[in-house]
């Protein structure tokens, strides 16, 4: 992702994965907001194997996976402007002081009839549980998909406003949670 939290990525075939894991994948960092200047374009995305996950909503035949990457400079150093690297550096600083940083976010979002109008898909209010409601089923499917990807969910419920829902993720270390949040996006 970029410094603004926008997801970035590219696709490779499974045959290219061993090469990507050892050498990384070259890309032009100058085109990503907040990364580098035009004269510092070469960057390498090196996959972190611990983040490998199959995307459960894709067909099982010729499955598709996602994996997060660390961004390295041409000389093999971690790129200072990579948000993931910034978090890793700060986790190490906290660890040296004897702290472990755990995070347990509440993801709040709305369901709308379409992407053009802000008309809520339901008229529920706080903690409403309507078993046959479309949004309750959508939220349930989201929770099951997150758990299938290894992201533990503690609870979920309808929030205060019509169409507003919340999913509470179970606490974990900051880096894992940052990756989990990007997966949720």
Q: What are the roles of these predicted feature ranges?
A:
Residues 1-185:
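Glycine-rich, acidic/polar active-site loops that bind/position phosphate-bearing ligands
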């Amino acid at each position: 992702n970029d410094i603004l939290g926008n997801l970035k990525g590219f696709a490779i075939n499974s045959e290219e994965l061993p090469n990507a894991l050892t050498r990384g994948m070259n890309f032009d960092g100058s085109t990503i907001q907040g990364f580098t200047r035009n004269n510092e374009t070469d960057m390498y995305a090196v996959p972190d194997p611990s983040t490998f996950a199959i995307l459960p909503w894709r067909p099982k035949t010729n499955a598709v996976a996602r994996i997060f990457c660390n961004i390295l400079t041409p000389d093999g150093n971690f790129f200072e402007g990579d948000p993931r690297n910034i978090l890793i550096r700060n986790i190490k600083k906290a660890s040296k002081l004897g702290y472990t940083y755990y995070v347990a976010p509440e993801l709040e979002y709305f369901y709308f009839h379409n992407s053009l109008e802000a008309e809520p898909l339901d008229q529920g209010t706080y903690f409403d549980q309507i078993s046959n409601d479309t949004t309750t089923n959508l939220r349930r499917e989201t929770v099951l998909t997150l758990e299938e990807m290894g992201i533990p969910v503690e609870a979920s419920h309808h929030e205060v406003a019509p169409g507003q829902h919340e999913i509470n993720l179970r606490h974990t270390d900051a880096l894992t949670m940052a990756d989990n949040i990007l997966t949720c996006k």
